[in-house]
């Protein structure tokens, strides 16, 4: 009888903790490795174009930006 009560209480506790943690993780990715992969994909060095203020000597500027301020060191991407 005591064992049954302990098991029931344990199951209820585990169920409640699962429901509580499910609310906190809503809208987040399930696996950390997937989040890290997305962060690496969006990393500044992984882009094929230069963002605002970045040099445009070795790579083209991103859409909506133009390479300005030539000179010896190359220009920078500006709107």
Swiss-Prot record:
GO terms for molecular function: ion channel inhibitor activity; toxin activity. It is found in: Secreted. It comes from the Eukaryota. Residues 23-47 form a propeptide. Residues 1-22 form the signal peptide. Disulfide bonds join 49-62, 56-67, 61-77. This is Conotoxin 8. Belongs to the conotoxin O1 superfamily. The keyword Disulfide bond applies. Keywords: Disulfide bond, Knottin, Secreted, Signal, Toxin. InterPro entries: Conotoxin. The presence of a 'disulfide through disulfide knot' structurally defines this protein as a knottin. It comes from Conus vexillum. One of its GO terms (cellular component) is extracellular region. Expressed by the venom duct. The keyword Transcription regulation does not apply.
